[in-house]
């Protein structure tokens, strides 16, 4: 290619150089010659005529290259000779002279087109006739209608054009070029313009015309209706070659435009998809052929599965072509009643009965409407539900949001319009998720308030939602119908019962049928008893759940239960019945009965009912269980178990009381106490709206509830309660007399509830006295939709607004909702009175210990008490809150606060005490006997007392003396008693525990003391003398090298203390930090707003930030671990910038335990000996123990016989394997550890240990915390069966280093995480799942449990799921072991296979356990079948069947029963045998024999000989001398282990070779070996032949090279330079190159991600492997080259493709011109190129990429992990613009990568000893450094991956060989044209030179 391009450049330079040399270009040269020649004609005409006979005026070159020239005279003579020649001769010459030549592809003449003049004339004549004929018959327009093809010739089309108008423009616009007649014989015709416009409109609707390729327009010009031939390209294109003329006739017809699309405004047309030739028009019209219509699907319906999901199958009835759809739309009205009505419009997956079609839906809706009409007749028009349901929506144009009928009309209109033009509508939808579509498609639509904008989501339903809604509605209305019984039915049933039985008894109630209804699809018979139970409670006779007594509405239709009852009979959590009274009811005979008689006749016995009787003075009477209404109604109140419900009396003007009862009858409560009167109350409630009690009286109490006893002795707790869900306030009391109470409740509570918009009052304490003074008329707001206050009282006409008795105890609790301005607003009068000498709000009591609280919680101003301007002569009243208390005990904060105001809204004050402008600033006080607690959830809990704000002060903890904050800015009171018992540590720069106090430097009222908060919220004060060392912004630290550094510190610090565990709660900044306000309500004094410095990481004691710091742990503060524990830094709260990381974890021994078995306790030890742990235990400094208790030379068992002198310092444990003894281990799991040395003579002791963390180094301190991070220690602890418990106990814990960058935090906290633990010398904390350690010493093994009688501060342990724990107790607990019987062992659970030893004799609760006392000291382990074990002596320590106490073991004949289980790890088993053992060896016979099989083996020195000639087999029957069935493990002394699994090792069929073969492969078959090596060292790696057999080369268990096939791959040092029988194929997973062999020589294909560098590329080009070889048309090639557009670009993925500018092509451009050059297939595009964080393994959170640019769900994206490997994952869910969920867990592939996907690795070096070096199997990363070794590792810690892009199915690849071939052909054409131009230049130059020479120019 480079050479070709170079040749082109050379040729171009040559031509350019010649032109430059001559100073002329071709155009100027031609012009000059023409000018000279013109000049000759003018200036030298005379000379020319004289020299005409000599001048050469004609020249002819024959086919044999003979040149003949003619002068003027010669030419004339020639012509004269021709003229005088014989005519025949002349005709003959004319006939024979060729004037046209046509050649075929081989260069031979085509006789039909190689013609003389005569032949040409004849040919033209024939052609003229043909053209004329063709003009008459040629098709230039065609279309198909009703299956009939219609063609229009040019004559027919021209006739139509001429017939319109003479004006060409008008004719072009209106001429008919297409005509269409529809099925109803309506004909539509189109001109060029109208046809183009119609096609444009169709294209907009169909949206499918963008695929048409615009053809080259044929030019045409007309003048006054006459065609101008020169510019009408019809016949002129026939000029050059006769062969092309014939072809051009059909080409011209095909390419002639017959439609144009004009701009409607200017009548100018554009070259676009709607300016079409006849060919294009025919193709478009062909689209509307009926065949096309039948085949093109424009609607699809998926089949629904039984579970409601959507299958991939189609319902053929509704999967339609556009033709079929048009047929259906044509008759849309019929379809509405037939097909559409049969389609499902609601789906309910749980109950198919509610999966309905439109017809069924209408039936159900009619039924539901009929039921609902009983409740709300306004819903009667629900029958038109289906007509109004929206089944079509449009987001921007409501004209296209249509109901079913409107949609049908719209579709019919559109179809009529389009079908009349032969147009189809392609409405195929792209359904990406049918389930989601089904859920989101609306079949009902409702707007809120009919505004047409705001959708009411409750009634806008999808198909599935509608099914569920109908299910719920039907269930509700069915419940109504279930208990619906009309008056007539009820009266008839009662009459029947009375007539049948003579009296209404319980028996008749049970048997008399009242009604039969349908419930749940089956008939249910209701008896009178059912009705009674349904009416008065108790449910009906069936087994379903019935609600408690329902709501009854007496109306003409009868009694029914409302549909909105919950399953528990309640609405909004309260019972809400209601009575709508009616005085009369009619029996079946039409006789009027009063309601009293009606109910009495209906129900007898103990049924307790209510009624309304207009004949009695008292408007409400109660009927008890006995007596008549006349004499008992006024005597008995309602029973205690039931509250009855009454309507409001219509008028009470003439009665004593509206509601009244009283009784001196005593009754016994459920708790045994005796009360006077009844506890039942009166309730007035509403289900639907207003709940109101109204009463008016001129002179009487409207409501008076009183008990019989006096105020001192009465214990009545009757209530008056009002509930409502909406509408008005619950209670209105109008007193029209100033002498009587409006509402008088003596010893009664008042409850008013309203869950909607109005006020609530809740006075809950039933022994309260509350009097509502009579109110003046019209004080209640006229429209109390939202009252301004919770309680509004105007007592301007009376002395008291709210008052209690002088000696009473009461509380008032007011809770304000979101819509209320203030809790209590007292206007013009005080709450307790209007006397100037009493407080505005007074809560006082002299009783010791009594609670006196005023609590308020509100979103607005909490408490406002204000007075107006004083008038002349009147003293301004004090604005005060007074709480007096003589009780001296100071309670803790928040327990009995005197005044607590909680504010929840930032711009409102919690408490406001206002003065008017002329008030005395000394007024307005807060006098507290206890605490003032002001809290907020935001940032503005405020105390505001007037124009000026208080001094900055902190009121945190007050003693019992009064602290008064006055409006004059003075603060009085003694705060010296604030707790100062504990002061901060002022000498240490770090914290010694998480149990910290928080401090802040403040200026206090006593002059500069430092106020601090303990974690429990109490306060401490550090006097001014201590502030300097704490509060200064700098302190010094000393690092390990002794360098002293000054460290900047601001703001908060952590402080150590030594308080007990129960004091260590979350440390919370709750101090009252008062700051100066600006004197107005909008900026009062502010609490709890503070700024803390940003924590810039963590450091440890004595270290400087940025250096490697260390966290020191106390071994007593982290639990023992059976594995090497890990430590991590965990941020407690966000935000933070970088999390800290740790390294170099050092652990030590936390606890050491010696077994209770004497053989493990050693000998020769005495108290005081020190024991050093064995070197084999682990790597690091060995631990040292001291012997405390030793008996008979052995260390006593337990955990107290050894103390830890030095816990050691280990970086790993490797010497002892970890063995888990049992599920609930008795001892620690790291067992069997021996000593390295002892200071005495003791030896042989073994012990078990637990590990704890000593220290970790901070590798990276982290940055940007706002709260101190948590240090989490993880491991497997012996105290629990869980292996995920975490804890950390930090003795030298973290300190915080602050920067000067402050972060504002609202109510932030430094809190201990749940994973932290705190300890002191008395108590040990484990974790939340394991309980607490006892404070008493209960023995070694039971150290983690506690004694009920002795524990003080501990907490009971919590068992893990499915497990139980043993507890110690002073008493016998069932299934637990008592302490007295525990000794060392405790009772463990019995499993299916094991029973455990019990320490005491068997008791009744000990079934299944063994008595240790009868089993001596040892237990024989169970031998294998046919074998025995050697004992220490002859059956001394053996337990067998002769030991009668052991009755629960198995013999060989009782295999199904239990056998004796081992006691612990080191105790043997009880023998399972029926006889005394006789097949064993003792120490006297074992010297030279193997125990149990001594006759077969002999021993000589270290050698063992098998004395028989047979074979030895391990795990199976041997066929050779030695066979092992299973793995063989060899452990060399100096090398790592070699493990052979299913392996054969030997010679086999390969003499002289060692081979390695899988056991399943026949070793005698040559070629089946895996590894073969000869003594010379020549090694063969082999795989046997077979399908799928191959070789894989792996690294880290991942394939890096794979070979499959039968070809050869040569890699030699010789001259082999080819690959034979091999194909390299790119591995799609991106791991490496895979090699796949084929058969025979195949084309080598290789795909790589990066560049290939080589000396040469050889391409197969042998002619013998090619066929159908043709020359490239040079003209076409040049045309293509002109269209191709080379580009400059850069690649998106620069990491893979490389940076820099690339010169090349765009495949999408090339495919337009050379489609053969471009192939499309699957590939990955780099359209994401972003780092993503992996959460929970399958969630990707991108940093920059917007997920809206993805193709959608189910698309595949390529992820690059930190090892450079690609992973293809599928997007399952797109959560938001940055987050997706994928189908593959990427947790194992994450790390830290930069924005280009390059892994960011951190280098770690470790110094190794010789022994550590020898232990490593892979030493590739270890180098020797003097006497030690240095190992270098790289880590990549993080949770990121790099996402490259998406997989696509149309990835474009280009074969540039096509471009080379086309370029070469184009160059040849350029060269030919260049040669012609050269010849022209030479000719012109010759002519020019001749002229210049001749004329002297």
Swiss-Prot record:
InterPro entries, per database record: S74_ICA (IPR030392)
Domain Peptidase S74, residue spans: 1661-1888
Top-rank lineage group of the source organism: Viruses
Coiled coil: 1865-1894
Keywords: Coiled coil
PROSITE patterns per UniProt: ICA (PS51688)
Official protein name in the record: Uncharacterized protein VP1
Protein source organism: Micromonas pusilla reovirus (isolate Netherlands/2005) (MpRV)
Lineage: Viruses, Riboviria, Orthornavirae, Duplornaviricota, Resentoviricetes
């Amino acid at each position: 290619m480079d050479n070709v391009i170079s040749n082109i450049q050379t040729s171009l330079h040559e031509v350019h150089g010649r032109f430059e040399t001559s100073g002329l270009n071709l155009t100027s040269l031609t012009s000059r010659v023409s000018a000279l020649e013109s000049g000759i004609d003018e200036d030298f005409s005379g000379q020319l005529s004289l020299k005409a006979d000599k001048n050469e005026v004609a020249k002819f070159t024959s086919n044999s290259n003979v040149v003949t020239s003619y002068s003027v005279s010669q030419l004339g003579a020639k012509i004269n000779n021709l003229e005088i020649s014989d005519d025949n001769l002349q005709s003959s010459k004319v006939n024979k002279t060729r004037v046209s030549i046509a050649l075929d592809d081989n260069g031979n003449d085509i006789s039909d087109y190689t013609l003389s003049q005569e032949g040409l004339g004849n040919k033209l004549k024939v052609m003229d006739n043909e053209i004329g004929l063709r003009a008459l018959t040629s098709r230039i327009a065609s279309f198909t209608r009703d299956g009939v093809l219609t063609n229009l010739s040019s004559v027919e089309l021209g006739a139509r054009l001429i017939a319109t108008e003479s004006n060409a423009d008008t004719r072009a616009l209106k001429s008919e070029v297409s005509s269409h007649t529809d099925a109803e014989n309506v004909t539509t015709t189109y001109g060029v313009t109208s046809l183009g416009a119609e096609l444009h409109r169709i294209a907009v609707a169909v949206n499918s015309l963008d695929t048409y390729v615009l053809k080259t327009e044929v030019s045409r010009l007309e003048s006054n209706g006459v065609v101008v031939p020169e510019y009408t390209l019809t016949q002129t294109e026939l000029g050059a070659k006769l062969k092309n003329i014939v072809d051009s006739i059909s080409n011209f017809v095909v390419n002639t435009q017959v439609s144009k699309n004009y701009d409607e405004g200017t009548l100018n047309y554009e070259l676009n998809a709607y300016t079409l030739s006849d060919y294009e028009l025919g193709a478009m019209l062909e689209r509307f052929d009926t065949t096309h219509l039948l085949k093109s699907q424009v609607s699809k319906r998926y089949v629904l599965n039984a579970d409601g999901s959507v299958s991939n199958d189609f319902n053929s009835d509704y999967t339609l072509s556009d033709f079929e759809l048009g047929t259906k739309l044509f008759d849309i009205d019929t379809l509405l009643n037939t097909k559409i009505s049969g389609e499902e419009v609601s789906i309910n997956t749980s109950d198919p009965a509610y999966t309905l079609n439109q017809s069924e839906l209408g039936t159900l809706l009619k039924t539901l409407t009929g039921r609902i009409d009983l409740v709300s007749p306004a819903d009667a028009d629900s029958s038109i539900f289906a007509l109004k349901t929206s089944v079509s929506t449009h987001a921007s144009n409501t004209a296209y949001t249509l109901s079913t009928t409107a949609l049908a009309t719209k579709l019919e209109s559109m179809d009529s319009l389009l079908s009349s033009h032969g147009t189809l509508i392609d409405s195929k939808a792209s359904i990406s998720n049918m389930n989601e579509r089904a859920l989101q498609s609306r079949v009902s639509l409702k707007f809120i308030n009919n505004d047409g904008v705001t959708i009411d989501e409750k009634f806008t339903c999808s198909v599935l939602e509608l099914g569920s809604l109908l299910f719920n509605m039907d269930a509700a209305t069915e419940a109504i119908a279930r208990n619906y019984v009309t008056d007539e039915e009820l009266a008839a049933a009662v009459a029947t019962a009375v007539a049948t039985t003579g009296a209404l008894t319980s028996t008749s109630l049970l048997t008399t049928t009242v009604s039969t209804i349908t419930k749940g699809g089956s008939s249910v018979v209701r008896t009178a008893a059912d009705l009674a139970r349904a009416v008065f409670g108790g449910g009906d006779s069936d087994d379903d759940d019935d609600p408690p007594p329902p709501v009854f509405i007496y109306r003409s239709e009868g009694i029914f239960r409302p549909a909105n009852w919950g399953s528990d009979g309640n609405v909004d959590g309260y019972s809400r019945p209601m009575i709508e009274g009616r005085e009369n009811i009619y029996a079946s005979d039409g006789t009027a009965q009063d309601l009293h008689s009606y109910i009495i006749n209906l129900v007898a016995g103990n049924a307790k009912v209510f009624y309304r009787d207009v004949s009695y003075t008292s408007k409400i009477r109660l009927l008890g269980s006995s007596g008549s209404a006349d004499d008992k109604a006024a005597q008995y109140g309602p029973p205690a178990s039931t509250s009855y419900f009454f309507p409001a009396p219509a008028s009470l003007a003439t009665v004593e009381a509206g509601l009244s009862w009283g009784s001196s009858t005593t009754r016994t409560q459920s708790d045994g106490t005796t009360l006077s009167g009844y506890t039942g109350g009166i309730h007035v409630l509403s289900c639907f709206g207003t709940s109101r009690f109204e009463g008016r009286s001129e002179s009487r109490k409207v409501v008076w509830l009183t008990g019989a006893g006096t105020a001192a002795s009465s214990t009545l707790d009757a209530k008056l309660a009002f509930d409502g869900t909406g509408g008005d306030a619950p209670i209105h009391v109008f007193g029209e007399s100033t002498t009587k109470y409006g509402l008088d409740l003596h010893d009664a509570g008042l409850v008013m509830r309203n869950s909607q918009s109005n006020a609530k009052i809740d006075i809950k304490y039933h022994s309260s006295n509350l009097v509502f003074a009579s109110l003046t008329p019209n004080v209640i707001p006229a429209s109390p939709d939202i009252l301004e206050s919770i309680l509004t009282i105007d007592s301007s006409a009376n002395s008291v607004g709210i008052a209690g008795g002088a000696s009473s105890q009461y509380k008032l609790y007011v809770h304000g909702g979101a819509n209320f301005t203030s809790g209590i607003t007292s206007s013009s009068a005080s709450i307790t009175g209007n006397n100037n000498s009493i407080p505005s709000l007074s809560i006082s009591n002299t009783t010791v210990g009594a609670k006196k609280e005023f609590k308020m919680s509100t979103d607005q101003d909490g408490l406002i008490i204000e007075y107006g301007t004083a008038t002349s002569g009147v003293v301004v009243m004090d604005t005060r809150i007074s709480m007096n208390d003589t009780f001296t005990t100071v309670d803790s904060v928040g327990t009995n606060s005197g005044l607590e105001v909680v504010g929840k809204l930032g711009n409102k004050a919690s408490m406001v005490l206002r003065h008017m402008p002329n008030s005395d600033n000394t007024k307005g006080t807060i006098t507290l006997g206890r605490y003032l607690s002001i809290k907020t959830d935001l940032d503005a809990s405020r105390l505001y007392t007037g124009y000026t704000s208080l001094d900055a002060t902190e009121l945190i903890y007050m003693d019992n003396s009064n602290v008064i904050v006055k409006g004059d800015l003075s603060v009085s009171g003694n705060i010296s008693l604030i707790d100062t018992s504990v002061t901060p540590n002022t000498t240490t720069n770090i914290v010694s525990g998480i149990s910290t106090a928080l401090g802040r430097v403040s200026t206090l009222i006593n002059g500069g003391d430092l106020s601090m908060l303990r974690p429990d919220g109490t306060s401490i004060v550090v006097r001014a003398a201590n502030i300097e060392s704490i509060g200064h912004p700098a302190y010094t630290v000393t690092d390990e090298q002794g360098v002293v550094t000054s460290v900047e510190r601001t703001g908060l610090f952590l402080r150590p203390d030594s308080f007990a565990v129960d004091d260590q709660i979350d440390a919370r900044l709750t101090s009252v930090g008062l700051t100066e306000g600006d004197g107005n309500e909008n900026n009062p004094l502010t609490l709890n707003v503070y700024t803390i410095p940003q924590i810039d990481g963590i450091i440890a004691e004595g270290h400087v930030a940025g250096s490697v710091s260390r966290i020191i742990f106390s071994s007593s503060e982290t639990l023992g671990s059976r594995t090497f524990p890990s430590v991590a830094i965990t941020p407690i709260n966000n935000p933070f910038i970088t999390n800290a990381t740790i390294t170099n974890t050092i652990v030590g021994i936390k606890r050491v335990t010696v077994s209770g078995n004497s053989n493990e306790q050693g000998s020769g030890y005495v108290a005081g000996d020190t024991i050093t742990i064995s070197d084999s235990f682990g790597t690091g400094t060995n631990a040292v123990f001291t012997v405390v208790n030793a008996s008979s030379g052995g260390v006593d068992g337990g955990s107290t016989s050894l103390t830890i002198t030095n816990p050691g310092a280990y970086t790993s444990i490797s010497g002892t394997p970890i063995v888990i003894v049992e599920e609930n281990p008795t001892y620690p799991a790291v067992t069997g550890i021996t000593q390295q040395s002892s200071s005495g003579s003791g030896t042989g002791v073994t012990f078990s240990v637990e590990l704890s963390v000593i220290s970790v180094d901070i590798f990276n301190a982290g940055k940007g915390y706002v709260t101190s991070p948590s240090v989490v220690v993880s491991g497997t602890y012996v105290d629990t069966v869980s292996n995920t418990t975490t804890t950390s106990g930090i003795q030298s814990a973290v300190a915080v280093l602050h920067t000067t960058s402050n972060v504002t935090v609202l109510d932030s906290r430094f809190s201990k995480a749940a994973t932290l633990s705190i300890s002191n010398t008395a108590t040990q904390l484990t974790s939340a799942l394991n309980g607490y350690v006892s404070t008493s010493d209960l023995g070694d093994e039971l150290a983690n449990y506690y004694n009920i009688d002795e524990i003080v501060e501990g907490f009971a342990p919590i068992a893990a799921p499915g497990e139980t724990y043993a507890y110690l107790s002073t008493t016998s607990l069932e299934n637990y072991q008592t302490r007295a019987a525990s000794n060392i062992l405790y009772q463990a659970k019995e499993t299916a296979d094991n029973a455990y030893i019990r320490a005491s004799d068997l008791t009744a609760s000990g079934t299944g356990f063994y008595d240790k006392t009868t089993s001596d000291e040892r237990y024989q382990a169970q031998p294998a079948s046919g074998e025995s074990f050697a004992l220490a002596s002859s059956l001394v320590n053996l337990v067998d069947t002769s030991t009668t106490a052991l009755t629960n073991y198995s013999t060989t004949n009782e295999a199904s029963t239990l056998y004796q289980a081992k006691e612990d790890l080191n105790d043997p088993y009880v023998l399972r045998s029926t006889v005394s053992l006789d097949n064993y060896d003792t120490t006297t016979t074992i010297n030279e024999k193997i125990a149990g099989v001594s006759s077969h083996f002999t021993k000589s020195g270290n050698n063992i000989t098998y004395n028989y000639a047979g074979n030895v087999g391990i795990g199976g029957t041997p066929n050779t001398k030695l066979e092992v069935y299973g793995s063989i493990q060899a452990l060399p002394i100096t090398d790592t282990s070699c493990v052979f699994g299913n392996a054969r090792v030997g010679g086999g069929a390969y003499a002289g070779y060692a081979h390695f073969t899988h056991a399943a492969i026949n070793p005698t078959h040559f070629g089946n070996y895996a590894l073969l090596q000869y003594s010379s060292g020549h090694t063969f790696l082999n795989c046997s032949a077979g399908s799928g057999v191959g070789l894989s080369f792996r690294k880290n268990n991942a394939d890096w090279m794979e070979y499959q096939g039968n070809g050869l791959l040569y890699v030699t040092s010789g001259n082999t330079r080819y690959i034979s029988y091999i194909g390299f194929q790119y591995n799609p997973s991106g791991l490496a190159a895979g090699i796949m062999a084929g058969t025979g020589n195949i084309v080598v294909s290789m795909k790589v991600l990066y560049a290939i560098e080589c000396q040469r590329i050889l391409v197969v080009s042998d002619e013998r492997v090619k066929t159908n070889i043709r020359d490239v048309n040079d003209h076409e090639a040049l045309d293509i080259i002109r269209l191709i557009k080379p580009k400059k670009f850069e690649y998106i993925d620069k990491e893979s493709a490389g940076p820099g500018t690339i010169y090349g092509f765009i495949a999408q451009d090339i495919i337009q011109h050379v489609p053969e050059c471009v192939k499309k297939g699957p590939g990955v595009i780099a359209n994401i190129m972003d780092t993503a964080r992996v959460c929970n393994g399958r969630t990707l959170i991108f940093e920059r990429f917007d997920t809206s640019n993805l193709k959608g769900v189910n698309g595949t994206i390529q992820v690059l992990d930190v090892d450079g490997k690609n992973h293809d994952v599928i997007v399952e869910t797109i959560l938001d613009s940055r987050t997706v969920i994928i189908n593959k867990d990427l947790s194992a592939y994450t790390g830290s990568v930069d924005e280009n996907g390059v892994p960011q690795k951190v280098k770690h070096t470790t110094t190794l000893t010789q022994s550590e070096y020898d232990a490593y199997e892979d030493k590739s990363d270890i180098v020797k450094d003097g006497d030690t070794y240095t190992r270098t590792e790289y880590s990549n810690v993080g949770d990121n991956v790099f996402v490259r892009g998406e997989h696509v199915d149309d990835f474009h690849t280009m074969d540039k060989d096509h471009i080379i071939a086309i370029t070469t052909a184009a160059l040849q054409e350029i060269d030919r044209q260049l040669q012609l131009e050269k010849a022209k230049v030479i000719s012109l130059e010759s002519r020019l030179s001749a002229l210049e020479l001749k004329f002297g120019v």
